[in-house]
Amino acid sequence: MGETVRFGISIDDKLLESFDRLIEQKGYMNRSEAVRDLIRAALVELKWEGGEEETVGTVTLVYNHHVRDLSDKLTEQQHSHHNEIVSALHVHLDAHNCLEVLVVRGKAREVKKIADELIGVKGVKHGKLVMTTTGEELH
């Protein structure tokens, strides 16, 4: 980690009040920690835009397992990306619905593509991709 540098920020008082409430809700010790997290998040998002950054994400799917061939289609998709899908969790939510959480690792562009393919399978009720960094480039 590099040397810590202090700098000032000019900010509207209403925005600062809102920021302070956010800091309290999130449990930050001080404004500096919150600002550092915001900067890191913005830098990670920026790197993903190029699509070449190594990333990891979770793809969450909710679907009715009684829908004809849906489970097989999802399994086929997962097997076609076995190098990128590093883990899968399957949960029976009730007598009809299942939840799958997949951990996917690879270039941002590829992770998004895999998520879109899985979420787009006909019969998936809800799907969401949450991407995060591998942490290698963060300080």
Curated annotation (Swiss-Prot):
Molecular function per GO: DNA binding; DNA-binding transcription factor activity; nickel cation binding
Record keywords: DNA-binding, Metal-binding, Nickel, Transcription, Transcription regulation
Requisite cofactors: Ni(2+)
Pfam families per record: NikR_C, RHH_1
Annotated residues for binding of Ni(2+): H79, H90, H92, C98
Gene3D superfamilies, per the entry: ACT-like. Chain A, domain 2, Met repressor-like
GO biological process: response to nickel cation
Protein role: Transcriptional regulator.
UniProt-listed HAMAP family: NikR
Family affiliation: Belongs to the transcriptional regulatory CopG/NikR family.
Name the UniProt record assigns to this protein: Putative nickel-responsive regulator
Species of provenance: Geobacter metallireducens (strain ATCC 53774 / DSM 7210 / GS-15)
